[in-house]
Regions:
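Short, well-ordered beta-strand elements
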Residues: 30-41, 89-92, 117-120, 166-167
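Surface-exposed binding/hinge segments that line
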Residues: 115-118, 123-175
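N-terminal lobe/hinge region of extracytoplasmic solute-binding protein
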Residues: 35-85, 122, 129
Length: 178
């Protein structure tokens, strides 16, 4: 049972990296076309729940890692990641030079930093966000207390150790993905 909880946490962590992170924008066409059976009602990746919402978010946002065709993990917005010997700390090193554009009305490109990921995870655990994905990260340090409103979001076990270095702290040992 403990192994399944560990496996579930790792799978959720990887899925959320994809769903929660910001997109790296490049030059080129400003149009995007895809087929869905209904119009997405929500483009917020932290609360997207319908199939059309999720498909849209998967096509709009990039993650720290991605799955390759053979099912293994490869860096996407990170250069690499490390897992501590006790498997309680996951450290991701972001690629340098990643940017995002906030909105059509503000064409400024902003640098993507570890603080952006920290903000996303902290927001996911705010009681008012009602993110269905928060439960998938229950192994993060202080996650239950933050979700219950007993501790501030800043107490969550996600930190920006450096501008391009993101650290996740876990309460349980996690089996490293293979």
């Amino acid at each position: 049972m403990h192994f399944l909880k560990q496996l579930r946490f790792v799978a959720a962590l990887l899925a959320a990296f994809f769903v929660l992170s910001l997109t790296a924008c490049g030059s080129g066409s400003n149009s995007f076309t895809w087929f869905v059976d209904s119009i997405p009602a929500n483009l917020d990746p932290q609360v997207a729940s319908s199939a059309s919402d999720i498909i849209a978010c998967e096509n709009l946002y990039s993650g720290l890692v991605r799955r390759t065709p053979d099912g293994s993990l490869a860096p996407e917005l990170c250069e690499r990641w490390e897992v501590s010997a006790d498997r309680l700390t996951y450290t991701f090193y972001l690629k340098d030079g990643l940017t995002y554009t906030a909105s059509k009305g503000d064409p400024t490109d902003y640098a993507i930093t570890a603080e952006d990921f920290v903000f996303a995870f902290q927001r996911m655990f705010l009681p008012g966000t009602n993110s269905p994905y928060a439960v998938e990260f229950s192994a993060l340090e202080n996650s239950a207390a933050v979700l219950a409103g007993q501790k501030p979001a800043s107490a969550l076990g996600v930190t920006a150790a450096e501008p391009l270095k993101l650290v996740f702290l876990s309460l349980i040992h996690i089996s490293e993905p293979t």
